[in-house]
Curated annotation (Swiss-Prot):
Pathway: Phospholipid metabolism; phosphatidylinositol phosphate biosynthesis
Organism of provenance: Rattus norvegicus
GO biological process, one term: natural killer cell mediated cytotoxicity
Description of how the protein assembles with itself and partners: Heterodimer of a catalytic subunit PIK3CB and a p85 regulatory subunit (PIK3R1, PIK3R2 or PIK3R3). Interaction with PIK3R2 is required for nuclear localization and nuclear export. Part of a complex with PIK3R1 and PTEN. Binding to PTEN may antagonize the lipid kinase activity under normal growth conditions. Part of a complex involved in autophagosome formation composed of PIK3C3 and PIK3R4. Interacts with BECN1, ATG14 and RAB5A.
Name assigned to this protein: Phosphatidylinositol 4,5-bisphosphate 3-kinase catalytic subunit beta isoform
Sites of Phosphoserine modification: S324, S1070
The enzyme's E.C. designation: 2.7.1.153, 2.7.11.1
Gene symbol of the encoding locus: Pik3cb
Amino acid sequence: MCFRSIMPPAMADTLDIWAVDSQIASDGSISVDFLLPTGIYIQLEVPREATISYIKQMLWKQVHNYPMFNLLMDIDSYMFACVNQTAVYEELEDETRRLCDVRPFLPVLKLVTRSCDPAEKLDSKIGVLIGKGLHEFDALKDPEVNEFRRKMRKFSEDKIQSLVGLSWIDWLKHTYPPEHEPSVLENLEDKLYGGKLVVAVHFENSQDVFSFQVSPNLNPIKINELAIQKRLTIRGKEEEASPCDYVLQVSGRVEYVFGDHPLIQFQYIRNCVMNRTLPHFILVECCKIKKMYEQEMIAIEAAINRNSSSLPLPLPPKKTRVISHVWGNNNPFQIVLVKGNKLNTEETVKVHVRAGLFHGTELLCKTVVSSEISGKNDHIWNEQLEFDINICDLPRMARLCFAVYAVLDKVKTKKSTKTINPSKYQTIRKAGKVHYPVAWVNTMVFDFKGQLRSGDVILHSWSSFPDELEEMLNPMGTVQTNPYAENATALHIKFPENKKQPYYYPPFDKIIEKAAEIASGDSANVSSRGGKKFLAVLKEILDRDPLSQLCENEMDLIWTLRQDCRENFPQSLPKLLLSIKWNKLEDVAQLQALLQIWPKLPPREALELLDFNYPDQYVREYAVGCLRQMSDEELSQYLLQLVQVLKYEPFLDCALSRFLLERALDNRRIGQFLFWHLRSEVHTPAVSIQFGVILEAYCRGSVGHMKVLSKQVEALNKLKTLNSLIKLNAMKLNRAKGKEAMHTCLKQSAYREALSDLQSPLNPCVILSELYVEKCRYMDSKMKPLWLVYSNRAFGEDAVGVIFKNGDDLRQDMLTLQMLRLMDLLWKEAGLDLRMLPYGCLATGDRSGLIEVVSTSETIADIQLNSSNVAATAAFNKDALLNWLKEYNSGDDLDRAIEEFTLSCAGYCVASYVLGIGDRHSDNIMVKKTGQLFHIDFGHILGNFKSKFGIKRERVPFILTYDFIHVIQQGKTGNTEKFGRFRQCCEDAYLILRRHGNLFITLFALMLTAGLPELTSVKDIQYLKDSLALGKSEEEALKQFKQKFDEALRESWTTKVNWMAHTVRKDYRS
């Protein structure tokens, strides 16, 4: 019987049935329809929280009373199946799951014979985990998708196979990789105890804690030895134990310290030293680790058997045929614009199509414009569009970009734009007419195999236009067509038919052959070197920032002196690539040959080559080759950008996607963040397929990680449901009742199980053990974020706080916090530790995600309010902050807290100025009890400051109020020495960042495709160039910063007025 045919009609109510407020009703039951193999239909009331096993037993007691019971087999021969929330047919093999966690799309369960196909079970689990059914990929019947999935399955299986031979210690390095920081900071020595490191160790299942003073350069195994000796001294001789029988585990975390690195290079120990806390370890017996290893090996071997049984049959060998290369075709490139459908314009409105050929943002030839026609539904052109470029000169990554425009007379504009929103998109005025963009779409000229496209193609277009257009086109847009074809404008075009044989772009060996042929025939090209005078000019051009435009003469000079560039300025490669004529096959061939002998760039410099401006396949392969030099820690630092630039890749199979998969499968920490960066955007139509198939490949290659990730996905689904409940009841219940309802929900066994004992998505080392329900609450803001507190079962460990947000886009916060982490890293590399606190933040879905709670901290607003009886004067109490620090610190601790405050305040002053962080009020600046100041909530960056009635609320470049200065000066008005040191810290920090200005510009440029509201075009990044004064000398830049510093100090009274208004408003609301 077909499952689809007997499904009852869909409910009219679109609200998620698992999120309605009946979930917290006393009975907590739901009516479920059961479909038996005999065709019998039974309806039962079952508890929402019941396990699948319990529900099956309930059903079995009832089936005795129905006809044809004798035709059924034993109960264990059956399992339930349903259609889940991602529209995937799912067989519920794991019967310990609860119904409310399975979350069927409708409350319908079908009893089916237990499946024996392990490959189907794995496919089903992967589909649920990634939030996209694998059947969707199959249904596309897309050769490129199928080819990529086949290759990636083989790639993943090879990775799994390589794990089988690993020793348990190598498996531990792969699964729980230690985090190292190779460089040693000078100021670390000041925080040691007489040059010694103090560590605490206790054996598992023992309360005895041993402390040692050791050299920071000892290896971890030495700590094992000292602990064993100490236990022998105290307890006497027990069973013989070797240091190699134990591994050091960080107390309260899934983090292990082992290997040959000195203790001080482990990130956990370094953080403890910097924060003046005691590193605490548990000595775990190796046999426990080995048991974990053996369990995973069983899962891996089962996965190998599953995969090998489901490998597709190899394709039959194709008949050899003559292949023609496009370099032999000197005909002009042309297409036929056949027609357009669903243009959504009035019948009298004329429409035309603009088409252009691009390589990155470079226009390869003049754009072509069709004739203007009008029509009701279909607009038929049947018009040939010829481009001023020969087929032989088309680069491999050329893309054909289209835009549909409605053309109106200026006089008629007001009457004729019922279906066009002129305020939403930019308009172009030409020859007394107004051109309104209606739709755009892009497609590649060559397919994924390098074959020149031919025949009819229907392109379903997109209607949302970016802020900036190149030649009235959108070349930076996706080359994927709109999957919502039913309502999208469609363009029907026709590429030339290649009747004899298809044309391909030449393979690499032919390209190199061509370059050699050109070089041998033109001796002038071989030299391409200049004298000292030209080198000086060249250096000046190459030293400019990435946003600087090159004029035609400068590009010609760079290309002519390309050998000088390679030998003397290898970092000039991006500018050389912008100087080449990509519409000239001879230049392209010579570049590819030159690229083979170009020195490897440092990874940070190579990142720029992954920008949209550099689409060439071999250039991107070169860039990825440079990135291979990155350590895992460095790769993690830039993972956010590397995932975003996948969107610039026109084809699924590329060097970058393979590189990311390879490193993720080698290091589970990288794997977890790659998983969430991809999964959080898998709902986006333009990248749904691309990100989905990469996620599938990761899951197939990391079956041992799937269980951990599934637990995280389940927990986040529960939090989303709870958040929906709170929003629904927010208007009905007062705050106390709402909090009580939340606690009732969290105490339910389904919630308790789903939200306990999971690795934090924010940090896989942190275990979220058990909810401290009474401390959990929801916050007052519009989206009602959930404030969750976890008690830590580990010896002497603090509680862990997490905020779940649903309805807010956290990606801009993620980017800003990443930049703060990078600044912290660059400062430390230069020997300056400004005690930055870039807390964890992770987008996990469509406008949802998690934020780390920084313990023992309060907002400036709360500190000021608690010290004053009148809200209006609270912001002007300069003693409040210093008194608050004195409340928690005294003596040397107070001096240390003021030092922490001074350094962190300097760091955030410089960071907020450079990044243009806006909306800085007293509720989004916080201070820890230990003195560290830090900023939260980054909704406005790059100089997008809030304004009211056209007047900017924030008039200062960064926040530096007199109560901050009061703390820095230790409460002494004339303490100019302390303030002078603070100012010097700010200036040093600014100059360090400025020296890495190109890196910041590159990283923001790589994020242009993310769709962040305040980062949509190159114009937005211009703010960074201005704030870092990249066009000026270091002396001029420092002078500019000093002026900004004085301005922040001089105008700080305006900040206080803003804070007063904010505090009064906050006090009134509460």
